[in-house]
């Protein structure tokens, strides 16, 4: 088997994109757009039913597809539970957790925050109005 070329080796297996089908594009653009921008993503694509934001080679899409079969996402059912993002320092996680409520997010697991993922895992778990969860993970010790 031939050795992969440098570009393939650098990107093979990397996440290319994530597409979230949402019941309300305007609401999702407000919440996800704010969060992704805060995490360093930049607007990438825009069309009638969707938007995307890109960081490096990876992008996140929110789309209000006419093919939706339900108006609600339930992260506790089979399928996607949450997206986890490296969010910078603990101070960055704290700042995002505090600001999230102004942008369509609610802090989850408040009784265990910021250690809901365990004593060695500093993170904020947030959920938008449509039930999508994001985990904001501190990358400093």
Locations of regions flagged by a protein language model:
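Vicinal oxygen chelate
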Residues: 2-11, 15-23, 73-99, 101-141
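Long, continuous compositionally biased terminal/linker segments
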Residues: 4-9, 55-88, 92-95
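Core segments of cupin and vicinal oxygen chelate
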Residues: 12, 19-64
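Alpha-helical elements of the RecA-like P-loop NTPase motor core of helicases
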Residues: 29-30, 94, 134
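Short amphipathic alpha-helices in soluble, non-transmembrane regions
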Residues: 31-34, 96-101
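A generic structural signal for ordered secondary structure
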Residues: 52-55, 84, 90, 100-103, ...
């Amino acid at each position: 088997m031939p050795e992969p070329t440098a570009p393939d080796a650098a990107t093979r297996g990397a996440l290319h994109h994530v597409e979230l089908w949402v019941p309300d594009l305007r609401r999702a653009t407000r919440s996800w757009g704010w969060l992704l921008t805060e995490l360093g993503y930049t607007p990438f694509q825009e069309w009638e039913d969707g938007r995307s934001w890109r960081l490096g080679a990876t992008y996140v899409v929110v789309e209000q597809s006419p093919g939706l079969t339900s108006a609600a996402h339930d992260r506790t059912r089979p399928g996607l539970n949450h997206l986890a993002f490296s969010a910078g320092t603990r101070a960055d996680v704290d700042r995002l957790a505090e600001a999230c409520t102004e942008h369509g997010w609610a802090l989850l697991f408040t009784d265990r925050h910021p250690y809901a993922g365990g004593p060695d895992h500093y993170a904020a778990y947030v959920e938008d109005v449509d039930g999508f969860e994001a985990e904001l993970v501190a990358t400093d010790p």
